[in-house]
Amino acid sequence: MEVENEASCSPGSASGGSREYKVVMLGAGGVGKSAMTMQFISHQFPDYHDPTIEDAYKTQVRIDNEPAYLDILDTAGQAEFTAMREQYMRGGEGFIICYSVTDRQSFQEAAKFKELIFQVRHTYEIPLVLVGNKIDLEQFRQVSTEEGLSLAQEYNCGFFETSAALRFCIDDAFHGLVREIRKKESMPSLMEKKLKRKDSLWKKLKGSLKKKRENMT
């Protein structure tokens, strides 16, 4: 799915020739990864989404007055290591690890997804943001804001609390990740030499997802 999105934090749509950012959504099933993605790209809240389905989406935005083309992989909510998971761990340039503030287990599982990234990339210096979703369900909160902030500080990454249902802070989370990627790109020894190889891995992964969808129809 490809949608051009005029994001709220940086008005205006991106022009041609935008830098492409390969983003991977991680987190336990049911935390709202797909709802966040759909709200970001199309300002729509899905009535239903199968948490076992992995899919890819594309959108263009402007972030800090620079065009950005986001290629977003919305993953299934299992923290097991698989061959396909290894592909998107290698191909992704940045990761959004999501949990639900109403589900303490999903918060605890965030560490498993962080470790999966390390198993493949062998470094913790990967662009990453931590997101606590479903803050519209405050009466059911099990994870405090302070706990989320503390974990983000441990990971040395950005932290956002969001509501996909209300489209609260959704743009901020995606924009924050792109800023982290751009920050890493300013250090060529860490990022620049790896971009071509990641692009090849990403294309291979997208082809695998397409075949899976075709087999399901």
From Swiss-Prot:
Pfam families: Ras
Keyword tags: Calmodulin-binding, Cell membrane, GTP-binding, Hydrolase, Membrane, Nucleotide-binding, Nucleus
EC number: 3.6.5.2
Gene3D superfamilies to which the protein is assigned, alphabetical: P-loop containing nucleotide triphosphate hydrolases (3.40.50.300)
Primary residence: nucleus
Enzyme class: hydrolase
A GO cellular-component term linked to this record: dendritic tree
Reaction(s) catalysed by this chain's protein: GTP + H2O = GDP + phosphate + H(+)
GO terms, biological process: adenylate cyclase-activating G protein-coupled receptor signaling pathway; chemical synaptic transmission; intracellular signal transduction; maintenance of protein location in cell; negative regulation of neuron projection development; positive regulation of MAPK cascade; positive regulation of neuron projection development; positive regulation of transcription by RNA polymerase II
Protein's cellular compartments: Nucleus; Cell membrane
Residues that, per the record, bind GTP: 27-34, 74-78, 133-136
UniProt-recorded Gene Ontology molecular function terms: calmodulin binding; chromatin binding; G protein activity; GDP binding; GTP binding; GTPase activity; semaphorin receptor binding
Tissue spec. comment: Neuron-specific.
PANTHER family given in the database record: RAS, DI-RAS, AND RHEB FAMILY MEMBERS OF SMALL GTPASE SUPERFAMILY (PTHR24070)
NCBIfam families referenced in this protein's UniProt entry, alphabetically: small_GTP (TIGR00231)
Subunit structure: Interacts with AFDN, the C-terminal domain of RALGDS and RLF, but not with RIN1 and PIK3CA. RLF binds exclusively to the active GTP-bound form. Binds calmodulin. Interacts with PLXNB3. Interacts with POU4F1 (via N-terminus); the interaction controls POU4F1 transactivation activity on some neuronal target genes.
Remaining remarks: Shows rapid uncatalyzed guanine nucleotide dissociation rates, which are much faster than those of most Ras subfamily members.
Function: Binds and exchanges GTP and GDP. Binds and modulates the activation of POU4F1 as gene expression regulator.
Family: Belongs to the small GTPase superfamily. Ras family.
Name recorded for this polypeptide: GTP-binding protein Rit2
Native source organism of the sequence: Homo sapiens (Human)
Gene: RIT2
